[in-house]
């Protein structure tokens, strides 16, 4: 009888261990959740375009005025903004209202900014077309600035195509870029922010989204394609 009891106990133990092992195998892991083909194939319903496709869409059209935002569009300028925050207002974004910060940012701190590859491709394309290139930024205007030279040097923009940077500034409840897009008769405007795209839409021109890098200090990241605009692939760098 004792042997039978021991045998039954052993069987029960084996069953329990086997059940536990199966549970461990079949239970999803929160650390390694895995994926499947459907998830891998899922894409956001966005109007993606390439630089080559944009160039092709302009075939046969005469030279025109085109505009670019600066920060997170043609330059990854977070290093300068990060330094400004640490220097002037570590616990808030008040540095953005400090003229001393803008004097630094507009007069040298863009030496720490990284030119974006997508901007190189776009600007090269527009230079080949003979287009007039403008940069319209929401930065505050300062008495002097070296941003125009920095951009011209970094992107090798000939003087015939380059225009001085337009410092539109930032005003509450107002998209300050609209008047400049209209005044300069721009036909395309590239930008990373919602304001860039809505400025183009308000002017009835083509607004094209460039992706903001995930490690930009400018948060939250915008929802690219939310207005049905074209979004350039691989444009986060």
Curated annotation (Swiss-Prot):
Residues 1-23 form the signal peptide. Substrate binds at residues 137-138, 177. The gene is aphA. The active site is at 69 (nucleophile), 71 (proton donor). Mg(2+) binds at residues 69, 71, 192. Its cofactor is Mg(2+). InterPro entries: Acid_phosphat_B-like, HAD-like_sf, HAD-SF_ppase_IIIB_AphA, HAD_sf. Keywords: Hydrolase, Magnesium, Metal-binding, Periplasm, Signal. It comes from Salmonella typhimurium. It catalyses: a phosphate monoester + H2O = an alcohol + phosphate. GO terms for molecular function: acid phosphatase activity; metal ion binding. Its main location: periplasm. Binds 1 Mg(2+) ion per subunit. This is Class B acid phosphatase. Dephosphorylates several organic phosphate monoesters. Also has a phosphotransferase activity catalyzing the transfer of low-energy phosphate groups from organic phosphate monoesters to free hydroxyl groups of various organic compounds. Its EC number is 3.1.3.2. Homotetramer. One of its GO terms (cellular component) is outer membrane-bounded periplasmic space. Changing residue 177 to R: 20-fold reduction in phosphatase activity. Nearly 2-fold increase in KM for pNPP in presence of 1 mM MgCl(2). Belongs to the class B bacterial acid phosphatase family. It is found in: Periplasm.
């Amino acid at each position: 009888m004792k042997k039978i009891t021991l045998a039954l106990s052993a069987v029960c133990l084996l069953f329990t261990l086997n059940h536990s092992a199966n549970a461990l195998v079949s239970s999803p892991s929160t650390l390694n959740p895995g994926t499947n083909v459907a998830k891998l194939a899922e894409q956001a319903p966005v109007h993606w375009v390439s630089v080559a496709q944009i160039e092709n869409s302009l075939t046969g059209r005469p030279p025109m005025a085109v505009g670019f935002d600066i920060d997170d569009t043609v330059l990854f300028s977070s290093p300068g903004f990060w330094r400004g925050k640490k220097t002037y207002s570590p616990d808030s974004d008040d540095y953005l209202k400090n003229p001393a910060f803008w004097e630094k940012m507009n007069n040298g701190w863009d030496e720490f900014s990284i030119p974006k590859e997508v901007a190189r491709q776009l600007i090269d394309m527009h230079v080949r077309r003979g287009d007039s290139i403008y940069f319209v930024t929401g930065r505050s205007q300062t008495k002097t600035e070296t941003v125009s030279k920095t951009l011209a040097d970094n992107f090798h923009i000939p003087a015939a195509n380059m225009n001085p940077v337009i410092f539109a500034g930032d005003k509450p409840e107002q998209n300050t870029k609209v008047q400049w897009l209209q005044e300069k008769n721009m036909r395309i405007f590239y930008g990373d922010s919602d304001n860039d795209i809505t400025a183009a839409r308000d002017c009835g021109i083509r607004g094209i989204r460039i992706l903001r890098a995930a490690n930009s200090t400018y948060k939250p990241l915008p929802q690219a394609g939310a207005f049905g605009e074209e979004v350039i692939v691989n444009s986060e760098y």
